[in-house]
Amino acid sequence: VELGLLDAGICGYDWVYENGNVGKVQEICELNYSKATTNPVRWVLAVPNDSKIKTVKDLQGKRISTEAIGIVKNYLKKNHVKADVEFSWGATEVKAPELVDAIVDLTETGSSLRANNLRIVDTMLTSTTRFIANKKSWKNAAKRAKLEQLKMLLTGALEAQRRVLLKCNAPAKTLDQVVKVM
């Protein structure tokens, strides 16, 4: 999207951040949904339950596995910690403690971390799904109008999931009684 190959897309804020595109794409709206809930997802630093690691400072010189190298390196830099960060091709939560000292993984509910006897030390980034556009496309009035329509449809569909539509065939004279029952 940022390169202009696509006018718009839907992705997690975490991937906009991971790829260095914050401010380089136009955020049209936030779409509050994820795999299991409508809550944001979190990139968390996790260690085995029996690990002596209690804070980010304890990661000095340690090995960390993650699918989000950029997020982790930025986090470590902000906290003045030097550690080895290696890319994980999936199943990150099973790598600690045998292969690495800590992991950084995406969690929505924490159930996978708990199932693998891991505890969360810190949350590095909270992310939600975003509808984004190429900045040049956003400035084009015709494209922007279509993107605004898509925004309305997407947000409307998500909002509709939280509502119930009830239709009822009843004589007009019983309207007050029907409303009381509902």
Where are these regions (language model features)?
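Domain-level signature for soluble enzymes in the chorismate/prephenate branch of the shikimate pathway
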Residues: 2-182
